[in-house]
């Protein structure tokens, strides 16, 4: 069964996405950040208010729905020459089932259709399985990411794929 992607626009879905983000981020990032720092990261970057501000800045959030259950979410922003994949998170039991790959490939098709020449994202420097995921999709590690916002330092790398 293939998942559906539901555009997050209404307040109800923004709050659903924020709750899902908090759940997944606390599972994914607990090995990289102490508890209070992680809580601050989630609040600054994935609270309902932060998601709403992103949406107001032309970021498109989507819930990933499979069999009526929210199993993850992703977000992207179209830039001048590229599509920036800002978030791609799935619940642990849905990883390794080609769902993330299909999301990345559909974003690449969208970017190509909009005449963009590349797609990029950031990955935590210690998240080796995620780096391998993007390398398998022909993304290359360009450089350390510059931190644009937030008070908690994030050790991230830029991965890019030329379309």
Enumerate the language-model features and the residues they cover.
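Short amphipathic helical patch at the helix-1/turn junction of helix-turn-helix
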Residues: 90, 124-125
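Glycine-rich phosphate-binding loop
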Residues: 94, 98
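Residues forming the Rossmann-fold NAD(P)(H) cofactor-binding site
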Residues: 101
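Conserved catalytic-core motifs of GNAT/GCN5-like acyltransferases
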Residues: 120-124, 135-156
